[in-house]
Amino acid sequence: MYRHEYHQSLVYKTWLCGKPGKVVNTFEQVLDHIRRIHDQTLGVPQICYLVGWQFEGHDSKYPAWSQVNDHLKRPEDAHAVDSLHWLMREAKRYNATVSLHINMCDAYESSPLWDEYVKFDLLVREADGSLKKGGIWGGEQSYLVSKTREWAGGQAKERIDALLKLLPLAESGTVHIDVFQPMPSLYHGITREDEMATMKSILGYWRSCNIDVTSEWWHHELVGLIPMVYHSNFDEASRLKYPPGLACGGGSAWNMRQPESDSRPGGFSRLPEPGCLFEEAWGHSVDHDLHQDLAKFSEQFYLRTLPFIFLNRFRALSHSQTAKTYEVQFSGDVWTQVHIADRHLTIRQQDRLVVDGSNVFLPALWRKDREYIAFSRRGGEMAWTVPPEWGAAQWVHSKSLFNGGVEEAVTIANDILKFTLLPNSAIVVRPSDM
């Protein structure tokens, strides 16, 4: 159905540059991050969307996508677009797909397309005919593109086609469209329903180009057209309804049912659903852009994405909650439980504990071998039951995913693995017959 298995991948955004030209990561630095993530995750499939790849950085010059950010190029390349081609090509060595974070909703007066979009009346207008303002992003006032008028006029196809000529997105097979929500235009008589129909046409065109589209949050009308959103706003009923291979989500940054949600900036409460109470019980991944703190990002992989990939191999069957616990039952005899008082998460499969708070012992399911990853935030003495697929293993191999792959001591007795982990460290463990 989709080009990629998003529910079995580490999907994230990397922050390159804010406007005007405030560089955080160059294309070379991004490749180094990708390489290090590959080494620390046993080569998990990565899908990395670049934020701020264009013009002067994130949210600059929309609706134009015609120029790669010169601040990010390698010294040896003549043009920034050559450097981006290089990054997209080299990332494949690390089981990584690199693509773009773009926007089809916003327009700025500084854009080279501004005059054209005003001339052909492609912007959303208020009832009195004035241009409808969007947010102020990076110090610039944004206005809103009428997707319905832009699609009808052919300009949407034109800028998609031009982008596909500029960069090998068809080869990447995925793109992330920021925001991507219906924008009614009162002056033009364009309704939410009109916009939603247009959005489906736009997604259909991307798909005809063999490219998946991911976005920021869910609209129910788009399930089956979008494989994944960065901020998952599904409630419990929808998480039971949709299999993760059809519709999955990243993290919970905009989960409006979290206790701290009342302290966040308003605006996103208008989303179709408010989210669920304890998203970790269902499986959640990362949804904070990677800047340069790779240690924190790696911890999120072990504590979020690794359980996310594991739980997404099963179907959520039922959900229950008491005054003390919040539980989800999955197929495969898998159970998750959150202790409400301290939000302590446990995950079990056939009564075998595989996640205990910030201690994790889970299979690397993207590998053909029977390898497991163990991680601990606090460190200390670990004891985990030998996985049933290991059979009657008498001893194991293990090595650190940090410190250059140093061999780690692991003992096995009475079907229990025992070893010591330093705080915020991970090892890979495999049976001796491998």
Segments predicted by a language model, with ranges:
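Beta-sheet entry/capping signal
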Residues: V44-Y49, N95-S99, G173-T174, N210-T214, ...
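Aromatic- and glycine-enriched glycan-recognition loops and surfaces
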Residues: Y12-K119, M196-K200
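Active-site-proximal substrate-binding groove within the catalytic cores of carbohydrate-active enzymes
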Residues: H4-F27, M104-A107, V118-G173, V179-M434
